[in-house]
């Protein structure tokens, strides 16, 4: 299954969670903040399977990953001696596109993915254009000099502070430590995702 590229506001309403992490989907003045569809404003009780599937889909949308990518990440997390769900989130947070977003070079993960895809960043002097690339702690990512005047980057840097596990200086950032569970998404129930794949 491919990565979802459609409108995210509708998906955010479906999940009752800001996929873009801006809460614009639920801001005052928006006509519809409930789930889409004819009966969107009615609560639907999900089955046990439905709850697990629901959480998995939410994780895919938040991080912008495909089913194949999420399953691969889960299998890698299972091999760890640490808590599988926490490691799963840490691996997703360690993706290059996510770190570009966390460092404040983009206002959304989609925007960050686009910047990476277009080759605006380098690692050790080499082009880094694979969004799913797993970045090791201690790695420094640099925005190319020719990309530093991009309006969307300049606006993002003014608006977005870097996350606690990323240090940003000028046009580069360093992924200096893995985030703790308490620092990551509080609205994601990663245990349900782990249980979904474990069945």
From Swiss-Prot:
What positions does the domain S4 RNA-binding occupy? 94-157
HAMAP family linked to this entry? Ribosomal_uS4_B
Question: Could you tell me the Gene Ontology terms of the biological process aspect for this record?
Answer: ribosomal small subunit biogenesis; translation
A GO MF term: rRNA binding
Annotated function: One of the primary rRNA binding proteins, it binds directly to 16S rRNA where it nucleates assembly of the body of the 30S subunit.
Q: Is DNA damage set as a keyword in this record? A: no
Gene3D superfamilies reported for this sequence: Ribosomal Protein S4 Delta 41, Chain A, domain 1, RNA-binding S4 domain
**What PROSITE patterns does the entry give?**
RIBOSOMAL_S4, S4
- Family membership: Belongs to the universal ribosomal protein uS4 family.
**Matching InterPro entries, A to Z?**
Ribosomal_uS4, Ribosomal_uS4_bac-type, Ribosomal_uS4_CS, Ribosomal_uS4_N, S4_RNA-bd, S4_RNA-bd_sf
The record ties this protein, via SUPFAM superfamilies, to: Alpha-L RNA-binding motif (SSF55174)
- Could you tell me what this protein is called? Small ribosomal subunit protein uS4
Q: Which GO terms describe its cellular component?
A: small ribosomal subunit
Species of origin: Mycoplasmopsis synoviae (strain 53) (Mycoplasma synoviae)
Transmembrane region(s): none
Quaternary structure, per UniProt, is: Part of the 30S ribosomal subunit. Contacts protein S5. The interaction surface between S4 and S5 is involved in control of translational fidelity.
User: Record's Pfam families?
Assistant: Ribosomal_S4, S4
Keywords from the named record: Ribonucleoprotein, Ribosomal protein, RNA-binding, rRNA-binding
